[in-house]
A protein has these predicted regions:
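Short amphipathic alpha-helix used as the core "switch/output" element in two-component signaling
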Residues: 69-80, 100-101
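Two-component/phosphorelay signaling modules centered on CheY-like receiver
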Residues: 16-36, 41, 108
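Acidic catalytic/metal-coordinating carboxylates
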Residues: 40, 66-71
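Active-site residues of response regulator receiver
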Residues: 59-61
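A Lys-centered signature of the CheY-like receiver
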Residues: 113
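Hydrophobic/aromatic residues positioned on beta-strands within the core alpha/beta folds
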Residues: 87-89
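As written
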Residues: 98-109
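Non-catalytic signal-transmission and effector/linker regions of two-component phosphorelay proteins
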Residues: 1-11, 17, 116-134
């Protein structure tokens, strides 16, 4: 199947500011619209109704009261078809997701850090395209 690459609207939550800036600069440079970025999951949750996004990039370990899984659950409760890409150093995240019924039949993928930036863009495009096919 041919990849359809379009300008994606992206929300990112990543607690390491240098990594957040790296993702934003890379994805913006590829023509995507990084609509909003957050250093903490609670801030992202407060804004998800205000900003339309095609995909959500989420780290697992976040400051505050919510980790990445909890942020993703909040997003999926509001937007059940939302594509979610976890980018994390937490090696057991895939196991945790696979045990949680909230994520069954959802469009979710995990990439482990360190990850090449091109791999992030490819995963995003695949998740968004998968959503279109459903």
């Amino acid at each position: 199947m041919e990849k359809i690459i379009k300008k994606l609207k992206i929300m990112i939550v990543e607690d390491e500011e240098d990594i957040l800036i790296l993702y934003k600069d890379f994805l913006s440079g590829k023509g995507h619209d990084v609509t909003t970025t957050y250093l903490d999951g609670e801030d992202m949750i407060e804004e998800i109704d205000k900003v339309k996004s095609d995909i959500y990039l989420i780290d697992y370990r976040l400051p505050g009261n919510k980790n990445g899984i909890e942020v993703a659950i909040e997003i999926l409760n509001k937007f059940p078809a939302a594509p979610i890409l976890f980018i994390t150093a937490y090696e057991n995240l895939q196991k945790e997701i696979s045990k949680n019924p909230v994520f069954y039949d959802k469009n979710v993928q995990v990439l482990l850090k360190p990850v090449k930036l091109d791999k992030i863009e490819n995963a995003m495009v695949n998740l968004v395209n998968k959503n279109r096919i459903k």
